[in-house]
């Protein structure tokens, strides 16, 4: 695309306190929001990752971008909330663009329903399962100030943090 410009923003790295602060709801559906969503997509692809939130780049707003595969493309979720979760649980390996190089199995609901607004400010609902359901839960946790490793046992969490610190030191 001629004239297209990628904007890759710096990622907030664990254990930055900003990752533990609940994000504020978006109230303005404008060009600034669309620019934020585009920057999130560029930053996520460069990381690389399949999901990112505005807090991952230091913006305390409830915005999520997911891109699980090329067929479905990228999707932006503004002010997403889980409105229903299945009783069935699954284990899935998770990680974060804010803590690259480490991952572990996390238990999540197998299916969820979310409500959210699109970039035009239209309310939407979406039912998801498998990887998309895991991503919805993971990213909404992040918007609520819960980093994914908080879902692990203390022993697993401490082991992952030590591994990440060692990797970060080089």
Curated annotation (Swiss-Prot):
Active-site annotation: 139
Pfam family, one: Pep_deformylase
SUPFAM superfamilies, sorted: Peptide deformylase (SSF56420)
CDD domains assigned to the protein according to its UniProt record, in alphabetical order: Pep_deformylase (cd00487)
Gene3D superfamilies given in the database record: Peptide deformylase
Sample GO molecular function, one term: peptide deformylase activity
GO biological process, one term: co-translational protein modification
Similarity-based family: Belongs to the polypeptide deformylase family.
NCBIfam families assigned to the protein according to its UniProt record, in alphabetical order: pept_deformyl, PRK00150.1-3, PRK12846.1-5
Name assigned to this protein: Peptide deformylase-like
Organism of provenance: Bradyrhizobium diazoefficiens (strain JCM 10833 / BCRC 13528 / IAM 13628 / NBRC 14792 / USDA 110)
